[in-house]
């Protein structure tokens, strides 16, 4: 919780100065001539397509609430959680209609949802908490439900060396965080009876987002 607060509670003015108008702090989808905001909304469309017309949705790590607000506008009953006071205040002010924004740890989530979404949150947890994160998905997802998880992956052949050292991002941007490798994430899902389907890799879009 201290790591989350140290990073995300720097003040919303700081993030508004350099994020796009949707306040999306994650990779967009297919950034191009129509601009970053359009690419972020394209990502939301893609995530919404993956979960279908789910009536009850949980978002783990909701950031400034853009995706939650988007899903609510499409008719979903959305519960969105974060540990950042600054993010939650901004989210409630801009996307409060139809969304239940909560300051809550994902480990404390108890409910049954038709769909779960999480965008670039698992990287902040640290390796020891990856199983707990997947426990949360399995516990709170209704039978037949869908989860759409966007995450930044580390290649298997680079992971061991990466995990043994602290790079610039771990030291100065996301203390306590670690990028997950897809093989490990998939194993954790399948061990809990979750089917791993429809994987889409778009790492190149992250580079374009940062540009």
Residue positions per predicted region:
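Conserved SAM-binding loop of SAM-dependent methyltransferases across substrates and taxa
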Residues: 64-75
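Conserved class I S-adenosyl-L-methionine
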Residues: 54-61
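Conserved SAM-binding strand-loop segment of SAM-dependent methyltransferases
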Residues: 96-107
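A short acidic, Gly/Pro-enriched loop at the edge of an enzyme's catalytic core
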Residues: 107-116
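Conserved beta-strand signature within the Rossmann-like core of class I S-adenosyl-L-methionine
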Residues: 144-152
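A short glycine-rich, Lys/Arg-flanked "PGG" loop and its adjoining helix->strand segment in the class I
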Residues: 131-143
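Substrate-binding/catalytic lobe of Class I Rossmann-like enzymes that use SAM or dcSAM, i.e.
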Residues: 153-211
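N-terminal auxiliary segments of SAM/dcSAM-dependent transferases
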Residues: 1-17
